[in-house]
Amino acid sequence: MATDLKLVVGLGNPGAKYAGTRHNIGFMALELLGERSGFSFRQQAKLHGLAADTGVGEQRLRLLMPQTYMNDSGRAIRAALDWFGLEPHQLLVLVDDMDLPLGRLRLRAQGSAGGHNGLRSTIQHLGTQAFPRLRIGIGAPAENPAERRVRTVSHVLGPFSKVEQPCVGAVLDAVLDGIQRLQRQSFERAGTWINGFRYDLEPVD
């Protein structure tokens, strides 16, 4: 049986300053979906974000990019669930994950914030960890823990390199494919495909 997916939220920070950064890969996925499907996002004050919808009937999907900044994403998600009369299990959050290499995806039905402020805010506002999230690997700035801490902010708020762009494109394609699979397949079956996705960067000479 297909999942009851009704709302997809991409996490990120608003404004041109953050466009295309690693932290905004959730936004990038929804923007690509809009470009390919021919719809545009509009500011919805009551939802604290840019919203759109696609599909009809049982395949209708609400889309949201919170404009609250990452650390307050949960406020927009709570507002959207309330406005559309949805439950947390009908939600999918697209979120960057520094603990996953670029080129990997992880679908989970629930879980902790894992140090991600956008997920932390969402858990706080929903009052539960039980909502699906698709973690999109962006890679870590360093393997050494101390160096990683120092470079985390500049890493997540920085752009993808030219070498990484083909991988980013493949990842975004896979995210959109994964969303379609979640609409047609069970969570477990879609998750098997999503979690098995792998795109390796070409080695640099």
Swiss-Prot record:
Pfam families: Pept_tRNA_hydro. TRNA binds at residues 18, 69, 71, 117. It is found in: Cytoplasm. The record marks 13 as: Discriminates between blocked and unblocked aminoacyl-tRNA. GO terms for cellular component: cytoplasm. Keywords: Cytoplasm, Hydrolase, RNA-binding, tRNA-binding. It catalyses: an N-acyl-L-alpha-aminoacyl-tRNA + H2O = an N-acyl-L-amino acid + a tRNA + H(+). Belongs to the PTH family. This is Peptidyl-tRNA hydrolase. The lineage of its organism: Bacteria, Bacillati, Cyanobacteriota, Cyanophyceae, Synechococcales.
